[in-house]
């Protein structure tokens, strides 16, 4: 039997210009949200007390944070810190969300190697019982010289990586989201949708 995604949440990065988070959390709770997705800039620099205060604020508003975006620098450079952030905030799925333009490979082999690197980066998180994957933007769907796409190569290079599919970015990349979901649906563990 196939699983169906039925739990909806709010991606807090979308509200980053409307701080403080305490007000955002209250508004989301009043709107009926139960889950939010965090992002690196909101928690990567917090100390233990700051993380606990953030968790208390979420709890006070009836919100959980089952997923979070964590930058590649933190994931590679300080996986213990990333694990602690996830533990304190209750994050069950970590998604690496972006690769700066100057760091992006130029060919299929480079993207395959990046997928392999991501899978290795994710090992401590998977070993800790968390889901680990990649969150796409549009650049992963631009055709490479060999006819493949970066997204195909990332998933091939990291065969155990999960995928947080951002549907609007797939469309912005001139790709068909239905085709991608059909081909890789079993690896999709979360989805971003926008209007």
Residues covered by each model-derived region:
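N-terminal pre-domain/capping segments
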Residues: 1-93, 162
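Short, charged N-terminal helix-start/capping segments
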Residues: 1-3, 94-104, 162-171
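Active-site beta-loop-alpha junctions enriched in small/polar residues
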Residues: 11-15, 39-43, 70-73, 99-101, ...
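Charged helix-capping and loop-helix junction motifs
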Residues: 23, 49-54, 79-82, 108-119, ...
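Alpha-helical structural signal in soluble globular domains
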Residues: 27-31, 53, 57-61, 85-89, ...
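Acidic/histidine-rich catalytic cores of soluble enzymes
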Residues: 35-36, 123-195
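Surface-exposed, active-site-proximal loop segments in enzymatic domains
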Residues: 74-85, 98-112
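Active-site groove signature of glycoside hydrolases
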Residues: 91-108, 128-140
């Amino acid at each position: 039997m196939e699983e169906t995604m039925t739990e909806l949440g709010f991606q807090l990065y979308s509200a980053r210009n409307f701080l403080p988070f305490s007000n955002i959390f209250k508004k989301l709770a009043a709107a009926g949200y139960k889950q939010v997705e965090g992002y690196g800039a909101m928690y990567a620099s917090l100390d233990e007390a700051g993380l606990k205060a953030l968790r208390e604020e979420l709890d006070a508003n009836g919100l959980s944070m089952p997923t979070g975006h964590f930058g590649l620098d933190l994931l590679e450079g300080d996986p213990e810190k990333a694990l602690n952030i996830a533990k304190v905030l209750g994050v069950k799925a970590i998604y690496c969300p972006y690769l700066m333009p100057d760091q992006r490979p130029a060919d299929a082999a480079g993207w395959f190697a990046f997928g392999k690197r991501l899978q290795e980066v994710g090992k401590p998180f998977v070993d800790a019982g968390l889901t680990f994957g990649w969150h796409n933007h549009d650049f992963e769907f631009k055709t490479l010289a060999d006819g493949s796409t970066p997204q195909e190569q990332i998933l091939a290079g990291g065969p155990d990586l999960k995928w947080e599919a951002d549907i609007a970015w797939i469309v912005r990349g001139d790709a068909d989201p239905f085709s991608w979901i059909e081909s890789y649906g079993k690896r999709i563990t979360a989805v971003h949708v926008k209007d």
